[in-house]
């Protein structure tokens, strides 16, 4: 586990973004942990979050020309990641995001920000079913751009309805790499370092045995 990954887990725990317990997911599964990136909701939170996204993007080595944040959750993530890449990595890259409803006045259209072109890095909080990615791909393709990769905060490394995870399906369907700040593997490694979290570690391991990929 890299230093920034450990720091991100501690950041998520401190903001109650990452919680342990029993949580019913949309799939109906009872998960021993829950991740809600919407609780990164202050200026300092966003500044830090952008730095973690930027660190993981640079660390991945994936080349891209533009950051795209799908509405709504992807919008602040793309914005803060773009700022962090410029401030901390000297990479001043364009970014844009889509509107849910296209405007018919002013500048018009369904996109805000830089023109959507070149190799696009799509940034979001998590991938659950991959629906948002598919919607974004339609927008990216319509503008003649290509998908360089997808960047999320947490990869749950969990099977969907079939044998693959939603992330593996995205990688297969769009021939792109999905990057995450952390995966379930790092989360388990972190829990294993903390004797006081032994009960949570056992629960998460049992869940991985049942639903992991």
Swiss-Prot record:
Q: Write the protein's name.
A: Orotate phosphoribosyltransferase
Could you tell me the EC number(s) of this protein?
2.4.2.10
Could you list this entry's UniProt keywords, alphabetically sorted: Glycosyltransferase, Magnesium, Pyrimidine biosynthesis, Transferase
Q: Name one Pfam family in it.
A: Pribosyltran
Enumerate the residues binding 5-phospho-alpha-D-ribose 1-diphosphate: 26, 72-73, 99-100, 103, 105, 124-132
Query: Which pathway does UniProt place it in?
Result: Pyrimidine metabolism; UMP biosynthesis via de novo pathway; UMP from orotate: step 1/2
Reactions catalysed, semicolon-separated, are: orotidine 5'-phosphate + diphosphate = orotate + 5-phospho-alpha-D-ribose 1-diphosphate
PROSITE patterns xrefs: PUR_PYR_PR_TRANSFER (PS00103)
